[in-house]
Amino acid sequence: PGRGAAQLDAEVSVAGADGPGELVTMRLRGAMASHTASVALPLLIPDAPVVVWWASHAPKAPSQDPLGMLARRRITDASLAARSRAELQMHASQYAPGDTDLAWTRVTGWRALLAAALDRPHAPVVSAEISAVRSSPSAPLLAAWLHTSLGVPVSMHASRGPGITSVRLHTADGEISMTRRDGVKTLLSVPGYPTSEVSLRRRDTKDL
């Protein structure tokens, strides 16, 4: 963007695999890439909800970006950045209602599994730990959620991945653990119950 001759390539899809309605995909190059809001605005239907998703590099403050200002929901993906955790912290510092990062969406399965495990009778959780590849932006979000939900200290440890590989909750009766080594299956262990294998596949962006 911003280099070469100004160019606009567009593709229009009508009620197909992408869902009902019309989908317009535009690729802006050169100087035109600096005027995304001006290009998109004439295509918007008055009062219709607008969602902006930055499929690559996102602005520092999505809600203050000219294109982001047109949207009710702004979606970023910190995992695409070279320094993904720093990217997530930057977006958090500029957060505005309507901002969403896919790093949070990626922990939905973990949160559901943790909630199911904690639905069983158990001793109070006194601490927790998360293991994940060092660059994972989802791990600190899951840690913050656990800390807020349980009110206990949560430590993070580096692993070889992929992504988050384990969550352990420490109780007086033993350890509630969820371990995923291959990015697909997770072993769930709860004191007093047999260990079970649960599907917890790492989801592609298109599945989020």
List the model feature ranges, each with a label.
Residues P1, W53-A55, D77-A81, P153-I164:
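A generic structural motif
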Residues P1-W53:
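An N-terminal, globular interaction/scaffold subdomain
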Residues Q7-S13, V39-A40, P62-M69, L142-W145:
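Short, aromatic/basic amphipathic alpha-helical patches
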Residues D9-V14, G68-A81, R168-D182:
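Acidic, Ser/Thr-rich peripheral helices and adjacent loops at domain boundaries
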Residues S13-A17, A81, P97-T105, P121, ...:
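Extended, compositionally simple fibrous regions characteristic of intermediate-filament-like scaffolds
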Residues A37-R106, A115:
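Contiguous mid-protein beta-loop-alpha structural module that forms a pocket-lining wall or clamp
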Residues L102-M156, G163-V167:
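ATP/pyrophosphate-binding catalytic subdomain of soluble kinases
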Residues L150-G151, G163-T165, H170-L208:
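Long, compositionally biased intrinsically disordered terminal regions
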